[in-house]
Amino acid sequence: MKRQLIRMLPRLIRNKLVYGTYLDIFLTHASPRHIHDKEDPCHKGFECFNWFIKKFQPSYFIHGHIHLYDLREKRVTQVDNTTVVNAYAHYIIHYPNKKINNNGDN
């Protein structure tokens, strides 16, 4: 997984230069480590996703995979400027439209 994130770096840097932000929404199958994950090997989150959230601060980090058997389980967690959402089954996010022009001004 780390390698896949590293391969994304050139595009993320380009986005920052052109649009003023690395990315708004990051969608994955697995969760970050210690955020909505479990301790068994199949449901353990990835540490590299925690690094990604700290470094690139997407507005939303959306993951699935972690089944919610109890409706009281936490499904949304705020990590600095990033909202981490367990979208297992379904989850509706209301995201504001952003107008971005070609020279990076919002």
Question: Language-model features: where?
Answer:
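Active-site-proximal segments of metal-dependent phosphoesterases and phosphodiesterases across multiple
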Residues: 21-57
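Context-gated lysine
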Residues: 2, 16, 38, 44, ...
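Binuclear metal-dependent hydrolase catalytic cores centered on His/Asp/Glu-rich metal-binding motifs
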Residues: 1-22, 42-50, 106
